[in-house]
Regions:
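Glycine-aromatic-enriched surface loops/turns that form tight recognition elements
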Residues: 1-107, 112-182
Length: 182
């Protein structure tokens, strides 16, 4: 799906089909010309199909939508069937095979997408645990390869928030992501 994302800032307003988009709102214009409007922030998605604002204190949700980026994230670190870390290729496969909330188009995030989840005010894990309660304070793979070696890819360490390159055969976890609204 090709989509255009427009973020308003300051005093700007955008008028589309007689609808006003205010500062801090996110809109997406899809190929079929449908318009999706979102307030800035997060929405928690529960396994039973219900949802709640990101500020809701419950932590039994299975996914979260980040309206600033338009991304939907699974909220639990993905490892092997025993919950252990895996190679980058195995993490990528596990993300692509994920079936969650009726969606089958999950994948691994890019370096920029995953690094944006790091919360510098937190430690072990360095991520907002009210939104991502199941993220382990360990290395998490991205889909971004390293320019200098096809044997390496980028990862984010959620223990302290580091971003670094790792050999693809090293062991880590994954956070699955997809574009919301698809």
């Amino acid at each position: 799906m090709n989509a255009i994302t427009i973020r308003t800032t300051g005093e700007a307003e955008i008028f589309i089909s007689s609808e006003t988009i205010r500062p801090g709102h996110l809109i997406e214009l899809d190929d079929d010309q449908s318009i999706h409007r979102y307030a800035a922030g997060h929405t928690k998605l529960f396994a039973d199909g219900t949802n709640a604002a990101g500020s809701d204190p419950r932590t039994d949700h299975v996914a979260v939508i980040d309206h600033a980026t338009g991304l939907m994230w699974a909220v639990k670190s993905i490892g092997d069937s025993d919950g252990d870390p895996m190679s980058q290729a195995d993490c990528d496969k596990a993300c692509r095979e994920l079936r969650l909330l009726g969606y089958d188009d999950w994948g691994m995030p890019t370096r920029a997408e995953l690094a944006a989840l790091v919360d510098d005010t937190r430690h072990e894990p360095a991520i907002d645990t009210s939104l991502f309660p199941g993220v382990l304070p360990r290395w998490h793979w991205t889909s971004t390869p390293c320019a200098w070696s096809s044997a390496s890819a980028w990862g984010v360490y959620f223990g302290h928030g580091y971003v670094s390159s790792l050999r693809r055969l090293s062991y880590g976890f994954a956070l699955a992501v997809r574009r919301a609204g698809q």
